[in-house]
Amino acid sequence: MTTGQQGLTYNAVYGVNLASAMSEYGYTSTVIPSKGSLDNLDKVASGAAQIGFTQADAFQYWRGRHVNEAQKVDIIGELADECVFVAVKKGGKVSDEGDLKAGVKIAVGEPTSGSYASWQYLQGLEKDYAKVETYAKGGVRSLAKVTTGEYDAFLWVSAPDRSNKFLEAVNQEGSGLAMIDMNGWHVDDKLPNGKPVYELKKAVTESGWLSDSKVKVPCTKTLVVANTDAGDDMLETASTVLLKNLSRVLGTNGK
């Protein structure tokens, strides 16, 4: 079972919980860390792993580039929402998503990450995004470079209902950073199962005494995918667990 970076949600929550639930049906699963959604899809398609996790938009991006390999990958379940967030420098070159065009520099995460795939996929849908200078750099260090002006924006993908290291950094007093809406376009692309790749949602970026700060952002689902040759019994069991025991796989504070 190919998951995600050590200690992050795909690895430490979804992978561990799905493996535990499947063990009750007699299946022993090894939960292996990975570099993210695209890495997982490569491993599932090649048979190096039987089950993996991926963002829905990363799956669409990958399918478009691996038409033959995609025949070996089946969606067997879906988990929670993940949303595309963009942080910018207050008073900088980018004040809203309409400023994401030629002459702007954005850091979007490592080349095997879901956030990188999200941006590549969005660039194919929105022509102005395709003109933005893109850097395959992630981590808080890259976010910090937005404050110095080395980058104009930083993109990441995370659950809309829980804090993470990037949001915490943006919300830090005196960070000089701000979040922007990403809702200036309409996307109606569909997954192979007929469901939309993105839905626009309001996500809380900071909780306040009187009101919460929110941004409108495109959200995609976490999909569970499997190799089509993994065996009918095993795939049936995994699908059953995902249907009947979803809250257990998500974990008590599931994303």
Q: Where are each of the predicted segments found?
A:
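Pocket-flanking alpha-helical
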Residues: 15-16, 32-70, 141-146, 161-170
